[in-house]
């Protein structure tokens, strides 16, 4: 049982769970663990736009420098940019301070190895062991402390990286693009990248104030984007989340395009271009059965993993896949990046749109998703899923669905929430079984 790390780093209420003391210890523990060889060790630190980012950044700097590591500060940058710059700047470790799509009150710490990949469970376990240890005797002497330096021009480096994922022959000229940056980490780089590629860009969610990240904007709140796309008759809307590792697209009609549909478009395009390294893609248990059926028609398979982009990526790396992701919009293209990258995923879709010279609605309507219902049940303590009444409700729901659908029950890895998802050909039945399980969970959690 892990004490600090969830499925996406350490996350919780800022100054409640994520305290300066914890951040200091994380810097010391990770700094000690990743000091290998005799060279001068360095860590790259980026963050999103939450007010608490200043506090956590400062504490991390103290932790890393106290064990002799030099710190390179990037300021507000997308998570995939931090991963990329960790590799590019030959750092021993990378850190992203973010709670992704969560509200500003939360924050988190994500760690990357020198290769830009998220840490394995084993490495995180070793860091947890050090977090609970007395490290005082392992701190550096006065002459061996690290230094901190703020790095300039990092935005331009990431913009150039993102642009290079498009073929040289492709421009975005003639496209009117609305991009919603969630008042988060991509508020500068996303609009600039799209503009440099030739698009007419209308940007929203680009005025962070420390409190408004993800508030009524971004990939988890796309209504503002939908309205703006319709109002301006834009060709496409692109919504990123707070740290820009996930994306949701809106077509010219204001219809939402989720991660499943994005993966379908890219999988078809890459199959035609013979770019897929395996005859299929990797997704999670939450991806729609319609995606699986569509890929089957193309002669491609769908491998499902546990929920979490880290598990998708682990399977991709172990089995040689170069395309995978989540319905929520984490799209991983290992030809380009070591983590989900919302901007790069959107650019790959725009590549297909420009090549085919068709509206986004036509390009993205690959399959009809099966009716799918997802509800969240919040609980305070205990294990509601172990209650007899809940077990009985789940068994009954699965029997009612039979072979005509799927039921997925899973606890969130980042918050005290249980997610209940069902899908099938009969929407009324799907709604009924989800409501039955949700009611049982609510009673058990009361």
Swiss-Prot record:
Ubl conjugation found in the keyword field: no
Residues engaged in binding Mg(2+): 100, 241, 243, 245
Reactions this protein catalyses: alpha-D-glucosamine 1-phosphate = D-glucosamine 6-phosphate
Residue positions of the active site: 100 (phosphoserine intermediate)
EC number: 5.4.2.10
UniProt-listed Pfam families: PGM_PMM_I, PGM_PMM_II, PGM_PMM_III, PGM_PMM_IV
Modified positions (Phosphoserine) in chain numbering: 100
Post-translation changes: Activated by phosphorylation.
Disulfide bond positions: none
Record's keyword terms, sorted: Isomerase, Magnesium, Metal-binding, Phosphoprotein
Cofactor: Mg(2+)
Molecular functions (GO terms): magnesium ion binding; phosphoglucosamine mutase activity; phosphomannomutase activity
GO cellular component annotations of the record: cytosol
InterPro entries in alphabetical order: A-D-PHexomutase_a/b/a-I, A-D-PHexomutase_a/b/a-I/II/III, A-D-PHexomutase_a/b/a-II, A-D-PHexomutase_a/b/a-III, A-D-PHexomutase_C, A-D-PHexomutase_C_sf, A-D-PHexomutase_CS, Alpha-D-phosphohexomutase_SF
Free-text comment on the cofactor: Binds 1 Mg(2+) ion per subunit.
Enzyme class: isomerase
GO biological process, one term: carbohydrate metabolic process
UniProt family annotation: Belongs to the phosphohexose mutase family.
Protein purpose: Catalyzes the conversion of glucosamine-6-phosphate to glucosamine-1-phosphate.
Record-linked NCBIfam families: glmM, PRK10887.1
The name this protein goes by in its record: Phosphoglucosamine mutase
Organism of derivation: Methylobacterium sp. (strain 4-46)
Lineage: Bacteria, Pseudomonadati, Pseudomonadota, Alphaproteobacteria, Hyphomicrobiales
GN (gene name): glmM
């Amino acid at each position: 049982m892990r004490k600090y790390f969830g499925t996406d780093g350490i996350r919780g209420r800022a100054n409640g769970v994520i305290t300066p003391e914890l951040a200091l210890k994380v810097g010391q523990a990770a700094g000690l663990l990743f000091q290998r060889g005799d060279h001068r060790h360095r860590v790259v630190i980026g963050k999103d736009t939450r007010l608490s980012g200043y506090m956590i950044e400062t504490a991390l700097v103290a932790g890393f420098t106290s064990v002799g590591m030099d710190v390179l500060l990037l300021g507000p940058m997308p998570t995939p940019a931090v991963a990329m710059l960790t590799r590019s700047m030959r750092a021993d470790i990378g850190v992203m301070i973010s709670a992704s799509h969560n509200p500003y009150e939360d924050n988190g710490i994500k760690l990357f190895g020198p290769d830009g990949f998220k840490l394995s469970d084993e490495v995180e376990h070793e860091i947890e062991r050090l977090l609970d240890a007395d490290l005082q005797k392992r701190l550096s002497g006065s002459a061996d402390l690290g230094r901190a330096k703020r790095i300039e021009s990092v935005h331009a480096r990431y913009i150039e990286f993102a642009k290079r994922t498009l073929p040289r022959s492709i421009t975005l000229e003639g496209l009117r693009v609305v991009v919603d940056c969630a008042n988060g980490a991509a508020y500068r780089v996303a609009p600039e990248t799209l503009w440099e590629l030739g698009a007419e860009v209308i940007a929203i969610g680009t005025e962070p104030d420390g409190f408004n990240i993800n508030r009524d904007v971004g990939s988890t709140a796309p209504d503002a984007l939908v309205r703006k796309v319709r109002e301006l008759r834009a060709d496409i809307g692109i919504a990123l989340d707070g740290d820009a590792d996930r994306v949701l697209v809106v077509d010219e009609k204001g219809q939402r395009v989720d991660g499943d549909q994005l993966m379908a478009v890219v999988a078809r395009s890459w199959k035609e271009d013979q770019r897929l390294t395996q005859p299929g893609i990797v997704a999670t248990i939450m991806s729609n059965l319609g995606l699986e059926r569509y890929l089957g028609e193309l002669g491609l398979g769908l491998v499902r993993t546990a929920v979490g982009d880290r598990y998708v990526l682990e399977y991709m790396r172990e089995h040689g896949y170069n395309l995978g992701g989540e319905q929520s919009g984490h799209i991983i293209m290992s030809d380009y990046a070591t983590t989900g990258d919302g901007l790069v995923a959107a650019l790959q879709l725009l590549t297909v749109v420009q090549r085919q010279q068709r509206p986004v609605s036509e390009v993205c309507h690959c399959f009809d998703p099966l009716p799918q219902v997802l509800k969240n049940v919040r609980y305070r303590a205990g294990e509601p899923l172990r209650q007899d009444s809940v077990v009985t409700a789940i068994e009954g729901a699965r029997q009612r669905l039979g072979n005509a659908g799927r039921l997925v029950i899973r606890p969130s890895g980042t918050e005290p929430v249980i997610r209940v998802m069902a899908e099938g050909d009969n929407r009324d039945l799907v709604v009924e079984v989800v409501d039955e399980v949700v009611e049982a969970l609510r009673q058990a959690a009361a």
